[in-house]
Amino acid sequence: MNKVLSQAIKKAVSEFKPQVDQKNKTKGPDLFSLNNNTELFQNSRGITIKIDRSRDENLTDFGKATLSDRYLGENESFQDLFARVASHYADDNLHAQRLYNYISNLWFMPATPVLSNGGTTRGLPISCFLNEASDSLNGILGLWSENVWLAARGGGIGSYWGNLRSIGEKIGRVGKTSGIIPFIKVMDSLTMAISQGSLRRGSAACYLPIDHPEIEEFIEMRRPTGGDPNRKALNLHHGVLVSDAFMRAVELDEQWALKSPKNGAVQSTVSARNLWIRLLTARVETGEPYIIFIDTVNRQIPQHHKLAGLTVKTSNLCSEITLPTGIDKEGRDRTAVCCLSSLNIEKYDEWKDDENFVDDVMRFLDNVLTDFINNAPEEFSDAKYSATKERSVGLGVMGLHSYYQKKMIPLESVMSKVWNKKIFENIQKKVDKSSKDLAEERGACPDAAEYGFKERFSNKTAIAPTASISIICGGTSPGVEPIAANSYTHKTLSGSFNVRNKYLRQLLEKQGKDTDETWSTITTNQGSVSHLDFLTQEEKDVFKTAFELDQRWLVDLSADRTPHIS
């Protein structure tokens, strides 16, 4: 601990008076009762936290390596990092201490840009941006410019290209367009050229509606073989916006009209069913495009956004965020923003009855959003405007499958459906209350206030992939996804690590089978335990991998929790 910080903490100790938790009218914790494992952390605002070095034991070697390689500042420890983030986005000492406790006990984890940049001058704490290109050269150039700035400051980007005319349509008197693909290819090159701080290269996704005349070429855009290599964008992600009308056409095996975005004129027709099969084939073979059922999304947007005439046209890099973009009724261009963090469902039994927990995290996210609005540069003006107007945040989850395995509940069971609903109903109730409480305390977001709604956040929850933070949280299962394998080698930017399912390990220990030989057979069997004859069928069902599960169960579980994602 440096000399200046030590002096500041000594001063804080000498001047300290026990705080009263205004929410519960109880005396606050004794921050300055220290032992061999604890010491004080204080930030530049004077927010003081008692940190516990023994909580490093909550982290796995893989989690520590991930934090060390990508998130720790100079001379910063794991607990220092957690305290830095908690103190920077806390309302006061008591809030900061609770936030630190939540993070260090792995109850929740801020999104990676918050971990990396919160409380520093390295970059911004926002991880998610959505925008759209207008059908003009200025609009395209403006999107490129904005995306360069967003990627350079750590953002993942989702851009809508459906406003642009397709290849061969008229420009002016005699000109013809070259279509959207060449412009997307330039975006591909620009994004790859920009580094997101020290964490990763720039990354972006492009979205197109299913009735755009270039949809067939767009679907194949990331295939390395076939077609013109000059009309490929191999590094971008891409998604297709599927309408209800298209799905009806698929069901009835009808022709599907591909229309000009400029005037709605039909450019060509294709078999809806063949186009759907082509889309699904590309998805099976390459993992993309993403599929967004856009009419379903727009039926579920907040009522105040419907009244304002706003619609969702696109999603983000990871396709879990759906927010309005483009020109609003005030003539301003919106680049949607959502700041993310995720609750750890694996620890659900520890925090489910804590009345402060979800509210504290929502306050944390509100403070993160305010930090972005106050400190983002002028190049982010459209994003700052959108964030100010709608104040959308995305409180997500991770560890759902790990929670099932911890409780020995097969994912393909009635009990998994019961817990799924119960968990997300509980979270929804608490985030809704927090949004209303914060609206009373700090004011409703302008979008909601204009129509008389008392909501601090237009959107409150979102299920992010949590690829990195699930590793930090002890290797819990990512997002709401099932575990891919019970034993495997995980390759990341931090290196390669052998990962073994801890709950399966506990079961094998009880059976006297926790040996390298057993784990070797699991690894060679693609992470499955189906071949282990000493396990019961129910035990095998609990530890089914993602590839062994009936995918209809995943669809059913998603459908059950969707009403509670807002």
What are these regions (language model features)?
Residues 1-566:
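Extended catalytic cores of very large enzyme megasubunits
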